[in-house]
Amino acid sequence: MLQNIIGRKREIELIENCINSNKPEFIAIYGRRRIGKTYLVKQLLGEKFSFYMTGVYQCSKNEMLAYFSEQLALYSGKKQPRPKTWFEAFSQLRAYLSTLLEEKEQIIIFVDELPWLDTPKSNFIRALDLFWNGWASDQPNIKFIVCGSATTWMTNKLLGDKGGLHNRVTRKIYLAPFDLNETELFLQSKGIVWTRHQIAECYMIMGGTPFYLNMIDKQYSLPQNIDMLFFAEGAELSNEYEFLFRSLFKDSILYRRIVELLAKKKVGMTREDVMKALHLTSGGKLSEAFNDLISCDFIRKYSSFGNKSNGAMYQLTDLYTLFYLHYIKGKEETDEHLWSNMIDSPSHRAWSGYAFEQLCLHHISQIKKKLGILGVQTNVYSWQQKANKEKGIEGAQIDLILDRRDQIINLCEMKYSLKAYDITPAYLQKLLDRREIFRQASNTSKALHLTFVTASGIKKNAQEGMIQSEVGLDDLFGEKV
């Protein structure tokens, strides 16, 4: 039911346009595990399915064919001999769907977790190729929808297939995690009454993954929920990290090594530095891993301002992973009430400061909207300059820079606090000095604006007047543009 879907307006529009088109459609919906792909399709179209089945993790070909046979009998109302191959299976599916061509305006087939059907030596891809190219692609009322969480498979075998399925997908839809606005709507739909500070901290821990958010119990506070989900004995999310990577990526060990390395470097690392640290001799697998991790929103690729030629930086930005690696992985003994006991501790303050920076990077469009520059061409950078005493070069770092076509550069400070942030005279001088260091290092002629992105605003004082623009927490909760 459409009213049960939170957010996803653009994705719903794309799917509905495909369903209502007058041509055959091969729709591939992909994204990381637990993000709500299956839920979206079932809520939107479940009552209209002419056939549905799902792959199951680590099931054999024979088990999957047996399940296919059961589903076909369920939808067709006729029991047939169990197929021995995927060629036979798709032939039976074609025969059944052919009986619907005249009576149904839309014939919707939904195959969920498609990658898990492609077991070794199963010839699944070839059979799917023959089904689509040999018949379904000529039927204007066929709407073939597939979903998959296994990113390596989806990008290599389907979306990037060089064989018969190359360019056959008519619509690719990537389902991203919720933003803050969608997270708030989701929690409200569950009867959870929290402040926006609490919702933001929840987002900083779990990210915008609906499956995780759905585990929250409305009768408990945020710290109590985090203790139960992450730190209590048998906590549901304490082992999620391992399975998440195994289910998404074929070579999950390499992907975890990359992520765990990047977790140690807040500003990120270059490709060459990652290769050297992991003792990799070939860059092919690393390039594929980077692309997959970016496409699943685990990491981001960015350029340092003025240093494009020195190679891109790769930075871990997935909030759940950052939290897990910081507080859970490798900890043999954990306090079952760790998060409740950590409120306002030095460790909590240090973590929340960095996590808030990552939250801001997930909401660049909301920041641009507040600054009134949605229609202005803007490049997003970070910047750092290492100190060199011999050359008289001072060190400096800016985590978010918005380089605008209208001759302004926003140098952004991201600050998380429960009270209005107090810009002291000493801190203002530090900001002004850093702005001048950046001006000299970048040799820019653009106007440099000091911009604060804060969780609780800026305290009104003499120094506050030197700040050109401010983005607040409520602005970050704005609807995605």
Positions of predicted regions on the chain:
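A cross-kingdom feature that marks ATP-driven nucleic-acid transaction machinery
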Residues: 305, 312-481
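Phosphate-binding site recognition
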Residues: 1-341, 346, 450
